[in-house]
């Protein structure tokens, strides 16, 4: 038996149209329902397009492809929201309370008066066809424990495959494409950062879609902590795509009147292949007021040239060669501070080492500037070696649960940015070095994942991520011309959450041009090339031992 989905009330309908994309949303039985998300169309969509059959042994009313996927409305898949009040109010049924829309945006407030919750959802479709969506949950009752709040978007029946990325250190962004099968396919990160084996976004596409043609839909979450993407398909063939922050137990506990704002979501559509999808995202990001306006300086990072062997006279010879070759920026990497003669010690002691730089960094910084180049410096402010003056003085400043010390990674632990004293130490230490040496560029590394990431014994990945955002924002406030390069053992923290606070991503620690061609190509599926750090790799490559021609290595770095 075929049954129509009920029509919406007058005025409770949003038809967004911009950038060659149309997005149609209606309120059905009090719930916001996404009717259409694809290429722009003229006229009206036929009601027959939404008719669905009701099988025997099924609900007597149609379950609509709503934003709010709730069991109370007969949705049997994964829900939009999970939470409770000490086991109560675990089931919600939100209804639209306020609804506003224009050609390019909508704002909806939903309320569940029984559960005493409101949810504000807003979206804007820009001139490039990129839909930016936000969600904010407010608690109007007693203490509410939020476990999950996800974004969900329905997929066209044409979307029969998914594309995401996997990898490891020095081998990021390997594409994996698969058929969308019945069930729930999930990609999630539990590292306290996106990670090497994670995806910048999830893509659904037609089987025939290639770089130049075919339809594709994509989600990318603006968040640098734990997160997840998934595609779910039921037995009737209806599929949806989702993204959301992964919340650890107790990370979001809302008192009366408190709110949780989810990380923003970017939703993209293209009918001109994967390149069309990338082009739309690049145009959107380039239109930001924060996007770099000047040509990107040609940068020499000294890490693979010297590693921990800091010698001023040796470095000056390299600087001379860099100036003659047309470089515009020289970055001094790890090893300039404390007892940091290897990765075993000194991390966290952000004072210039008198052992290797007895007169400070002023001499080499001025030498570089006198050659007409900019001086940049490496930091890893979120981390600490157990063998360091900082850790010996403040062992309680790390992320931990009770007195349990987690496993080290590259011989280091993670400082707790939710601890105000630790946060102030990092901020003030970096600020002092930047001011003392007039530094306008830093490479900020992150070489350990977050495990047992507790603050006052409570899960703190969310607070740690927010602390990093606050730290970067404050550094840029104090140093107006500062540019930050985001690095995390290479490309393990490339995302749309941190992008407004940084000016470049280090794409991978692998500088082998053959490997880099793939890594850069797929990183550019979401991130514009001018924001992706590239180097002309050594010969032979330090990661692969492979010898490649200079022209190939140079062209790969340039393009």
Features from the language model and the residues they span:
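Short acidic, Pro/Gly- and aromatic-enriched capping/linker segments at domain boundaries
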Residues: 2-13, 235-255, 481
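Polysaccharide-binding surfaces and accessory modules of carbohydrate-active proteins
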Residues: 4-7, 12-24, 32-232
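Active-site and adjacent substrate-binding regions of carbohydrate-active enzymes
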Residues: 20, 135-137, 338, 353, ...
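Glycine-rich, aromatic-flanked loop segments that form ligand/cofactor-binding clefts
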Residues: 60-94, 206-230, 268-290, 327-334, ...
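Short Pro-Gly-centered flexible turn/kink motifs
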Residues: 94-96, 252-270
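Structured core elements
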Residues: 253, 261, 299, 329-331, ...
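Aromatic-lined carbohydrate-binding/catalytic grooves of carbohydrate-active enzymes
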Residues: 293-428, 441
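Glycan-recognition surfaces
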Residues: 385-424, 465-559
């Amino acid at each position: 038996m075929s049954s129509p989905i009920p029509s919406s009330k007058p005025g409770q309908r949003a038809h967004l149209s911009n950038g060659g994309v149309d997005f149609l949303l209606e309120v059905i039985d009090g719930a916001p329902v996404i009717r259409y998300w694809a290429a722009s169309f003229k006229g009206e969509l036929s009601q027959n397009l939404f008719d669905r059959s009701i099988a025997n042994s099924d609900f007597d009313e149609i379950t609509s492809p709503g934003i709010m996927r709730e069991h109370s409305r007969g949705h049997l898949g994964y829900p939009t929201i999970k939470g409770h009040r000490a086991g109560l109010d675990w089931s919600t049924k939100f209804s639209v309370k306020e609804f506003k829309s224009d050609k390019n945006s909508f704002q909806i407030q939903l309320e569940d008066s029984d559960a005493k919750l409101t949810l504000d959802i807003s979206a804007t479709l820009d001139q490039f066809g990129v839909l930016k969506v936000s969600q904010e949950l407010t608690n109007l009752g007693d203490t509410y424990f939020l476990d999950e709040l996800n974004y969900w978007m329905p997929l066209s029946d044409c979307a029969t495959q998914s594309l995401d990325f996997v990898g490891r250190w020095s081998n990021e962004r390997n594409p994996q494409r698969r058929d969308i099968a019945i069930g729930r396919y999930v990609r999630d990160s539990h590292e306290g950062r996106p990670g090497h084996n994670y995806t910048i976004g999830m893509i659904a596409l037609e089987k025939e879609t290639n770089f130049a043609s075919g339809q594709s839909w994509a989600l990318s979450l603006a968040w640098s902590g734990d997160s997840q993407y998934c595609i779910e398909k039921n037995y009737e063939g209806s599929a949806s795509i989702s993204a959301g922050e992964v919340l650890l137990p107790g990370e979001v506990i809302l008192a009366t009147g408190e709110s949780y704002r989810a990380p923003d979501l970017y939703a993209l559509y293209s009918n001109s292949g994967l390149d069309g999808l990338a082009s739309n995202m690049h145009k959107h990001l380039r239109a930001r007021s924060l996007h770099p306006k000047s040509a990107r300086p040609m940068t020499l990072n000294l890490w693979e040239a010297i590693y921990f062997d800091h010698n001023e006279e040796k470095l000056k010879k390299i600087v001379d060669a860099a100036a003659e070759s047309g470089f515009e920026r020289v970055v001094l990497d790890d090893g300039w501070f404390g007892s940091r003669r290897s990765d075993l010690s000194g991390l966290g002691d952000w004072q210039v080492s008198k052992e290797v730089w007895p007169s400070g960094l002023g001499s080499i910084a001025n030498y570089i500037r006198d050659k007409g180049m900019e001086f940049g410096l490496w930091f890893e402010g979120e981390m600490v070696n157990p063998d360091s003056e900082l850790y010996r003085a403040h062992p309680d400043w790390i992320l931990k649960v009770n007195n349990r010390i987690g496993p080290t990674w590259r011989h280091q632990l993670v400082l707790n940015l939710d601890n105000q004293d630790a946060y102030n130490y990092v901020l003030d230490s970096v600020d002092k070095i930047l001011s003392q040496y007039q530094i306008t560029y830093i490479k900020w590394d992150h070489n350990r994942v977050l495990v047992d990431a507790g603050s006052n014994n409570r899960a703190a990945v969310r607070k740690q991520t927010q602390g990093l955002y606050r730290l970067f924002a404050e550094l840029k406030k104090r140093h107006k011309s500062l540019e930050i390069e985001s690095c995390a053992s290479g490309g393990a923290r490339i995302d749309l959450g941190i992008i407004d606070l940084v000016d470049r991503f280090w794409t991978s620690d692998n500088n082998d041009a053959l490997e880099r061609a793939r890594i850069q190509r797929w990183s550019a599926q979401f991130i514009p090339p001018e924001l992706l750090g590239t180097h002309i790799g050594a010969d032979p490559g330090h990661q692969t031992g492979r010898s490649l021609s200079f022209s190939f290595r140079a062209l790969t770095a340039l393009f």
